[in-house]
From Swiss-Prot:
Detected in spleen. Secreted by cultured macrophages. It is an enzyme of class 3 (hydrolase). Degrades chitin, chitotriose and chitobiose. May participate in the defense against nematodes and other pathogens. Isoform 3 has no enzymatic activity. GO terms for biological process: chitin catabolic process; immune response; polysaccharide catabolic process; polysaccharide digestion; response to bacterium. Residues 417-466 form the Chitin-binding type-2 domain. Coiled coil: none annotated. Its EC number is 3.2.1.14. Gene3D superfamilies: Glycosidases. Very high plasma levels of CHIT1 are found in patients with Gaucher disease type 1 (GD I). Can be used as diagnostic aid and to evaluate the success of treatment that brings levels back to normal. The lineage of its organism: Eukaryota, Metazoa, Chordata, Craniata, Vertebrata. It comes from Homo sapiens. The keyword Hydrolase applies. InterPro entries: Chitin-bd_dom, Chitin-bd_dom_sf, Chitinase_II/V-like_cat, Chitinase_insertion_sf, Glyco_hydro18_cat, Glyco_hydro_18_chit_AS, Glycoside_hydrolase_SF, Glycosyl_Hydrlase_18. Residues 392-424 are annotated as: Disordered. This is Chitotriosidase-1.
């Protein structure tokens, strides 16, 4: 019997073995489930082979303890972490906080050693209970937005407490150590007020730099959401509102380049122009752009809403290496395939640890809008980072059980359905045929074939040249 699986095929069905150390960190948002029609996004829409790390946004905090935020989070956790059965190399993290979460609960939690210990203990229990591989701290921001100046040092202490506890728990439990990351701002004011960069970088596994939202409808003139460099005419504070300045700042303050993950947006920031005849960068604007048909948020448009604009004019900001479009009195600064390629080239030159994406649900994830296939922006990152790539659409075959018709021409012989009994989920060689392999998932046995000319290697759990 042929079994069709969403985003069929396992990550290991590759033309080359896994060897790149680059990370591709992708955020999943638990509110995208409420969008209408084709834009609704759930864990089933995720490609388990697309990103190296998936981060679930967001968890909350109750009485200094990690907690859910949506009515169905526990169900979504199960589906989200179940993706690791299809890609055993995938790592999943849970993010706590976010912009709308505010700062008060973080401030209260870090205020005393007892409160921090309560949080740390709850985090370990919560992550293990729901099968996450780590925690992502998204406090926006210590020392700002109502958070007192003392929270700068207290955030450092929190990071140290979590890192120490994660290490101790791994030694006690015998399990792989939980990962610890943080989403951090690009703006110098926020960084100076809230982060002892060299100290937290020692204890974080990686640092997700939110290199976007440099400009938006909160300003009175148009500007790009995520420019790579400054414009020639910019000086002073304005000259620091770009990706390059943010990266240099975090590196100079002590972040190892290999730990710094460059954030990239799959959305644009939109404006309503004061005059439809003045469409330049820096043109006067009266406020946020018109809400998109799916995201329904003024001043922000998903890539799948931007790419399908009819009658719009697209131009590139040569100094900043990014595009914008305009139509009538609407103006949007966004990223496209070309700008993502340029940014990956940049991060490689800087020796950074990889790319981060906000967010999965804002790319054209189903290929319904841009005529560029599924996940055109994130697939571009994957390819440019030289991560092994599995084309979607490869069918997964369930091994026939006794009495079932043997539709897969080269399926295992009847009786091998017991192969996975007592085995951990994962990939195993087919002793009868090197060009195929077995996969065990929740006690079920599946067989897949390598591409023509390749054989399965048990050492890398991948298809490679003979």
């Amino acid at each position: 019997m042929v079994r069709s699986v969403a985003w069929a095929g396992f990550m290991v069905l590759l033309m080359i073995p896994w060897g790149s150390a680059a990370k591709l960190v992708c955020y999943f948002t638990n509110w995208a489930q409420y969008r209408q029609g084709e834009a609704r996004f759930l864990p089933k829409d995720l490609d388990p082979s697309l990103c190296t790390h998936l981060i679930y946004a967001f968890a909350g905090m109750t009485n200094h303890q990690l907690s859910t935020t949506e009515w169905n989070d526990e169900t979504l956790y199960q589906e989200f972490n179940g993706l690791k059965k299809m890609n055993p190399k995938l790592k999943t993290l849970l993010a706590i906080g976010g912009w709308n979460f505010g700062t008060q609960k973080f401030t209260d939690m870090v205020a005393t050693a007892n409160n921090r210990q309560t949080f740390v203990n709850s985090a370990i229990r919560f992550l293990r209970k729901y099968s996450f591989d780590g925690l992502d701290l998204d406090w926006e921001y210590p020392g700002s937005q109502g958070s007192p100046a003392v929270d700068k040092e207290r955030f450092t202490t929190l990071v140290q407490d979590l890192a120490n506890a994660f290490q101790q728990e791994a030694q006690t439990s015998g399990k792989e150590r939980l990962l610890l990351s943080a989403a951090v701002p690009a703006g110098q004011t926020y960084v100076d007020a809230g982060y002892e960069v060299d100290k937290i970088a020692q204890n974080l596994d990686f640092v997700n730099l939110m290199a976007y939202d440099f400009h938006g409808s909160w300003e009175k003139v148009t500007g790009h959401n995520s420019p790579l460099y400054k414009r020639q005419e910019e000086s002073g504070a304005a000259a620091s509102l770009n990706v390059d300045a943010a990266v240099q700042q975090w590196l100079q303050k002590g972040t190892p380049a290999s730990k710094l993950i460059l954030g990239m947006p799959t959305y644009g920031r939109s404006f309503t122009l004061a005059s439809s005849s003045d469409t330049r960068v820096g043109a006067p604007a009266t406020g946020s752009g018109t809400p998109g048909p799916f995201t329904k948020e003024g001043g922000m448009l998903a890539y799948y809403e931007v790419c399908s604009w009819k009658g719009a004019t697209k131009q590139r900001i040569q100094d900043q290496k990014v595009p914008y479009i305009f139509r009538d009195n609407q103006w949007v600064g966004f990223d496209d395939v070309e700008s993502f390629k340029t940014k990956v080239s940049y991060l490689k030159q800087k020796g950074l640890g990889g790319a981060m994406v906000w967010a999965l649900d804002l790319d054209d994830f189903a290929g319904f809008s841009c005529n560029q296939g599924r996940y055109p922006l994130i697939q571009t990152l994957r390819q440019e980072l030289s991560l092994p790539y599995l084309p979607s659409g490869t069918p997964e075959l369930e091994v026939p059980k006794p009495g079932q018709p043997s539709e897969p021409e080269h399926g295992p012989s009847p009786g091998q359905d017991t192969f996975c009994q007592g085995k951990a989920d994962g990939l195993y060689p087919n002793p009868r045929e090197r060009s195929s392999f077995y996969s065990c998932a929740a006690g079920r046995l599946f067989q897949q074939s390598c591409p023509t000319g390749l054989v399965f290697s048990n050492s890398c759990k991948c298809c490679t040249w003979n």
